[in-house]
């Protein structure tokens, strides 16, 4: 063999050997290496994933392929920390998410040769395997078979190998410099989209409507692109600020029946300016799964039913209004009233049993995050047997910016029991009530409430005269 050729081959082998030593085959880590995993799930399409894996590392520079991560991972949020062991230095991080699909596989083979399995030309013949060159994938596949160009060739495609730059699942790839040989634990955390949680509550009202059983279910939805087996789960209730918001996801709502919740499975605590709920056991949350877990259960909480009218006429607007009276249920979230747990925002469905013992749906409302010792008011619907009418009976222009007017309301109660109706009236500008037929309470700077008793099968009129000044 020519001496120059020998020298060239020897040099090439040396280069290849050095490259293989400098960049050995990547170490692959999968969910099998996982020693623990935890999730902190937020209300706004977000979760923090925290996991620990155990690997065997070597001294020197090499790559780690960290597989089985969420498809909706925020790669810029990844944190890697060695726990004990020989340790390593993180030199570079990449996130590979060019996932294998039939279309991407074909795109990678443009300009390359492959095999086509074509159907038989006639019945009784065998399938034909031919070599072809893929010329284009634009709006369909174009092949060169021999000296001919074939469009939309029917049949199966056989590829000789999988392209190196396609991955079957999202993968973090780290270039690290190991400080020694040995077993190494990695503490890895990252943020991911595709997670959400909410609360669905059930209030079962007693026959006398003075108390009720209140239960809550946590509904967790996982569309992150990964499964989390035997995970420790925590929930954050509160409005965290984010620079970029993920789109709202549709949720699975709780079962539409007043099912009794099991024993509370979450421990609640204040955390920073939020509230943290920690599941007392581990659970598996599969990809594309909705899971419900009991949050709380309280029996016999005191309830107060309220009838409320919100009057919208006054100095401006129509002269008359007529409508139904809103029905509300109210309770206090306190230990003295058999609750006393910070309630995450969610939907409350209200039920009551009829005289035959059959559960009936009364209505539903949403609540915001509710601290301990705050009141919860739920609008259930509108009263069938209570009618409200309001009209403006007088209107006077005193000066350019001063007006006086008189309002009259009539409440007609067709029920077999006496009730109290609250009429909420709003004012604008500087106002004063000059005269009124009933006592009233100033609730806010611009809102007063008349609490009007109405007897069974009776009616009651309420009137007031007001003066308003605006600038």
Language-model-detected regions and their locations in the chain:
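Long, intrinsically disordered, low-complexity accessory segments associated with secretion
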Residues: 3-8, 21-471
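Sec-dependent N-terminal signal peptides
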Residues: 7-15
């Amino acid at each position: 063999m020519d001496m120059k050729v020998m020298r060239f081959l020897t040099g090439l082998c040396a280069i290849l050997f050095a490259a293989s030593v400098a960049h050995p085959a990547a170490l692959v880590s999968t969910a099998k290496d996982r020693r623990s995993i935890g999730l902190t799930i937020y209300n706004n399409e977000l979760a923090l994933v925290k996991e620990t894996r155990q690997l065997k590392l070597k001294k020197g520079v090499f790559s780690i392929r960290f597989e089985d991560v969420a498809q909706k991972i925020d790669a810029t949020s990844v944190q890697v920390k060695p726990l004990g062991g020989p340790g390593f230095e993180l030199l570079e991080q990449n996130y590979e998410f060019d996932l294998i699909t039939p279309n991407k596989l074909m795109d990678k083979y443009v300009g390359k040769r492959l095999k086509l399995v074509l159907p038989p030309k006639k019945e009784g013949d065998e399938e034909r395997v031919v070599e072809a060159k893929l010329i284009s994938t634009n709006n369909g596949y174009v092949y060169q078979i021999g000296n001919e160009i074939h469009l939309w060739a029917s049949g199966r495609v056989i590829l000789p190998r999988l392209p190196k730059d396609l991955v079957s699942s999202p993968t973090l790839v780290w270039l690290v410099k190991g400080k020694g040989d040995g077993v190494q634990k990695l503490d890895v955390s990252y943020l991911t989209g595709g997670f959400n949680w909410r609360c669905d509550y059930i209030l079962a009202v007693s026959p006398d409507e003075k108390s009720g059983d209140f239960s809550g279910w946590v509904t967790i939805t996982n569309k992150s692109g990964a499964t989390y087996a035997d995970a420790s789960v925590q929930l954050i209730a509160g409005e965290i600020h984010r620079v970029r918001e993920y789109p709202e996801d549709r949720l699975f709502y709780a079962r539409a029946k007043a099912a009794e919740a099991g024993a509370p499975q979450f421990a609640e605590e204040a955390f920073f300016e939020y509230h943290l709920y920690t599941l007392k056991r581990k659970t598996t949350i599969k990809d594309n799964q909705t899971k419900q877990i009991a949050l709380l259960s309280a029996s016999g909480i005191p309830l107060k039913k309220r009838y409320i009218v919100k009057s919208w006429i006054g100095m401006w607007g129509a002269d008359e209004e007529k409508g139904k009276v809103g029905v509300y249920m109210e309770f206090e979230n306190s230990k003295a009233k058999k609750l006393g747990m910070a309630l995450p925002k969610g939907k409350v469905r209200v039920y009551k049993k009829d005289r035959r013992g059959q559960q009936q749906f009364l209505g539903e409302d949403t609540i915001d995050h509710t601290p301990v010792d705050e009141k919860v008011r739920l609008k259930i619907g509108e009263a069938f047997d209570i009618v409200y009418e309001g009209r403006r009976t007088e209107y006077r222009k005193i000066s350019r910016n001063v007006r006086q007017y008189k309002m009259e309301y009539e409440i007609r109660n067709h029920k077999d029991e006496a009730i109290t109706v609250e009429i909420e009236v709003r004012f604008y500008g500087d106002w004063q009530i000059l005269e009124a037929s009933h006592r009233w309470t100033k609730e806010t700077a611009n809102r007063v409430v008349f609490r009007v008793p109405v007897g069974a099968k009776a009616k009651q009129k309420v009137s007031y005269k007001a003066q308003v000044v605006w600038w």
